[in-house]
Regions:
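Inter-helical turn/loop elements of alpha-helical hairpins
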Residues: 21, 28-43, 47-51, 56-93, ...
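Alpha-helical repeat scaffolds
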Residues: 41-44, 72-86, 109-119, 143-156, ...
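Residue-level signature for tetratricopeptide repeat
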Residues: 29-30, 62, 101-102, 135, ...
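Canonical tetratricopeptide repeat
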Residues: 58, 131, 169, 203, ...
């Protein structure tokens, strides 16, 4: 019988029957925990109950998470048939439909705003909370990444199911805004509640990275590996482990992780490809010979090139193509983003993305002075392309290396000093890039 049920967290859910609700809940919980098969779960939910409208919208969300042209097209195919049904939708379904529709249309800001309205409608809508934070992450809107969780914290007492997920989300927001002590407290509270909370583990890994507590980071991820290694987010966690080894100049260990859990499966998902490109780029900055790895990664990257959708991805593709010497593909990405980017991505590309693409391409080609000009101008607004502070740290590292290789020793030393002051425990990586330590 059609009607309104509630999901696992007590939020109303418009359904055609009871059959799909548990499967829908499993899909949302899988997204929150970063474990399991969320796509399979939501497909099973709508197969059991085609009237589960939010299930169809979640299918679209999962396609959009791919941050690719193919993902957008798949989402549009799911969302378009729902337009005629809008008059019969509940408030929650309407707000989520608007969010997914805006995201698919390229208006990522409006998508986030619709999810904020969904949280005003019901502050315990965990689906809205998770996707809103992820969108703010994609948008580089660091303050909103934290505040969207702050506003609903009081709605989540410790005894309520889902509390641990909310603590993990809040921990990551605190970390990205530089409140490392509070981030660690909330992350550890979440992990005490649920040791398999991958987002909380991720937040704590970021704290260790940003504070230069490398030994603690290695120990934490090693001791907790059984809790996160089966996650579909595991490649990114292994990337953090590799960064710790890189900070300690343990290049063989970092390469071993690259060859093992990071690239063994040769995933063609952007979330995995960007980690691979970033790691190889950083290793090369340190003068490490990565062999044929860059050529192999470039082949994989070339397979997923599509209409420009998220310039953060294309920036990392430039890293891979630059290392492999594929100037034609670098130029294609620059041209495509200038001519065909739309919506939020077009604005972000104009503000910072194009400068990052050209700056990294220039560095790869040995045009270090041009790289200096571009990266110096863009570094203060690079956050708009999205990603975390740890991911965007590669901008400063590349600028230091460019200054060093261009013979701008004074600039290089000042940049290293600035980075060391900002991250006292992580000064070694910058220092190695000074003249004589990198080639």
């Amino acid at each position: 019988m059609s009607g309104v049920r509630t999901d696992r967290w007590g939020v109303p859910l418009q359904t055609g029957s009871d059959a799909g609700v548990p499967l829908f809940d499993d899909a949302v919980e899988s997204l929150l925990s970063l474990h399991g098969e969320p796509v399979a779960a939501v497909e099973a939910a709508v197969a059991a109950d085609d009237g589960l409208v939010l299930g169809h919208i979640v299918r679209a969300y999962f396609s959009l998470y791919r941050t690719s042209g193919a993902g957008v097209r798949a989402a549009e195919e799911i969302l378009t048939p729902l337009e005629d049904a809008r008059v019969t939708l509940g408030e929650r379904e309407i707000l989520h439909w608007r969010a997914a529709r805006a995201w698919a249309a390229g208006d990522w800001d409006e998508a986030a705003h619709s999810l904020e309205r969904a949280l005003l409608h019901d502050s315990q809508d965990l689906l809205a909370l998770k996707i809103a934070q992820d969108l703010y992450f994609f948008l580089g809107q660091t303050r909103d990444l934290q505040s969207v969780v702050t506003r609903v914290l009081r709605a989540w007492p410790a005894q309520k199911p889902g509390w641990g997920y909310v603590q993990g989300l809040y921990a990551f927001g605190l970390e990205e805004n530089g409140d490392y002590a509070q981030a660690e407290l909330f992350a550890r509270a979440a992990l005490h509640h649920n040791p398999r909370g991958v987002w909380a583990s991720h937040a704590l890994a970021h704290v260790f990275e940003m504070e230069g507590r490398v030994d603690e980071g290695v120990r934490f991820l090693t001791e907790s590996v059984s809790h996160w290694s089966s996650s579909f987010f595991a490649v990114h966690t292994w990337w953090h482990q590799a960064l710790y080894h890189l900070e300690r100049a343990e290049y063989d260990a970092a390469l071993s992780l690259y060859d093992g859990p990071i690239r063994r499966q040769r995933s063609l998902e952007w979330v995995d490809l960007i980690d691979a490109a970033s790691l190889l780029w950083r290793l090369t900055l340190d003068g490490v010979d990565v062999g044929e790895r860059s050529a192999t990664l470039a082949v994989d990257m070339a397979q997923v090139l599509d209409a420009p959708t998220y310039v953060f991805n294309d920036w990392h593709a430039v890293m891979a193509f630059g290392l492999a010497g594929h100037v034609d593909l670098e130029e294609h990405l620059l041209s495509d983003n200038r001519r065909h980017a739309v919506g939020t991505n077009r604005a972000v590309a104009a503000q910072a993305g194009l400068a990052l693409l050209e700056g990294f391409s220039s560095f790869a080609a040995g045009r270090f002075n041009r790289a200096i000009d571009l990266l110096t101008d863009v570094r203060s607004c690079a956050h708009v392309v999205g990603g975390s502070n740890a991911q965007r740290d590669v901008v400063d590292l590349t600028l230091i290396a460019a200054a060093s290789r261009a013979g701008e020793d004074g600039m290089a030393r000042q940049l290293v000093a600035e980075r060391a002051a900002r991250r006292p425990g992580a000064a070694a990586a910058g220092g190695r890039l000074l003249a004589g330590n990198a080639s």
